[in-house]
Structure formats: structure tokens, C-alpha cells
Amino acid sequence: TGLVSGDSIEPDKEKNVITKETETVKLSCSYSTTSNNVRLYWYRQYLHGEIMFLAYKGARSVSAGKTADNRFQSTTSHTSTELTITDVRLSDSALYYCALR
């Protein structure tokens, strides 16, 4: 299923996050939906690069979800999703997207 009328998702803060290598960063998005079967996705895009999958998790799932790298963990609630990046590296410098499906 795709985005349904009335569904929305947006970053909690549109900002640049500045951190040091090896630290932990948390990014979050708030969403609303009328669907009971929702998956929340995280992607990143390097400057002039393709968008790459990072993680997804069912909105109402207690399982860990799927990630492309174990440094990335996604958590969800009924109104938000959070991406935690541990052991931050210089190569994590990118634009991050959250998506609802």
C-alpha cells in the first residue's frame, strides 16, 4: 500500500546535526495515519548520490525491524519513529529521510 489521504510524516526538526566520531546521534520524525499496517523507513543520500535504504520497522511491531548496518536502529511509537546511529563515522555525513508506507 502507498500513502493514503490523511497520512503524513515529517521530521521533528529540520536541522543540521553536528557531532563527533564515535558518538551516538538520534534523528526523529512524527507521523499520523489511519492505517493499521504501517512501516516506517529510513534512508540516506550522499551529496549527488543515490538514496540508500538504512532501516525499516513496523509502526506497531515489537520486533527490531530490518537494518542495513547494525549501527543503525529504528524504534517506533504510534506517532513517531527514531533512527539511532551509534559509533558515528565521517562517512555518515549525509541527508537522512524518513518515509511512511
Task: Give residue ranges: language-model regions.
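Extracellular domains of the immunoglobulin superfamily
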Residues: 1-101
